């Protein structure tokens, strides 16, 4: 499938969630042992943790949206990564969307983030902590040139390279989505230590943040993992294909309704949403 078709499918998957979803009516995590259920783009979570809003190592953006819930493994990853970044004197980690209290489909902006295993992290590390006003209305820093072919040299910093690398080297991380131009710059900067690049995947948009995805927890028996990324650093022909013009004759795919929920997620909705 060419990149234009993939982009249209991704847009449809995201826009399908623009209507209000019943998951928004669940305002607190569902009690129980932590269980991620279903797939990243069609699932839910029982026993989600709340990411502590106050931390010396990170700051949480858009708290009014209440998207700071996730599997305990995700909360621990954020705390682990931000502590590493702080210990290296790199700055404060800016945390974007995680998931809703019970996971599930958003009403816009994300097709995934449904099982408590995804988090968006800004690709900037301020030395001075942001104010409450800045956190509620964050200003993203677009690192990619207008033509989409490379990063903006004056904005690309070694600390951002290190942030992505630290995240990719974490044992629980299975994928990190960034803009193709950012992946390209990582390939140029990586040197001989390249194993971690396999986890960094080019994807549409993602010009100012990275989308980190964790593997399914071993005890979440109904969680559906993705296949591992292809072998290698992903810096060759696959990456270059993202910079090629779309093939002529690409047709817009038909709009699809969301797939049925996993039975456990449907049962959760039936019990907790009137």
UniProtKB/Swiss-Prot annotation:
Its cofactor is Zn(2+). Its main location: periplasm. One of its GO terms (biological process) is peptidoglycan metabolic process. Gene3D superfamilies: 3.30.1380.10. Disulfide bonds join 44-265, 187-235, 216-223. Residues 227-274 are annotated as: Disordered. Zn(2+) 1 binds at residues 110, 113, 120, 211. GO terms for molecular function: metal ion binding; metalloendopeptidase activity; serine-type endopeptidase activity. GO terms for cellular component: outer membrane-bounded periplasmic space. Murein endopeptidase that cleaves the D-alanyl-meso-2,6-diamino-pimelyl amide bond that connects peptidoglycan strands. Likely plays a role in the removal of murein from the sacculus. Pfam families: Peptidase_M74 (PF03411). Belongs to the peptidase M74 family. The keyword Protease applies. Its EC number is 3.4.24.-. Dimer. Binds 2 Zn(2+) ions per subunit. Zn(2+) ion 1 is bound in the active site. Zn(2+) ion 2 is bound at the dimer interface by residues from both subunits. This is Penicillin-insensitive murein endopeptidase. Zn(2+) 2 binds at residues 147, 150. It is found in: Periplasm. It is an enzyme of class 3 (hydrolase). Residues 1-19 form the signal peptide. It comes from the Bacteria.
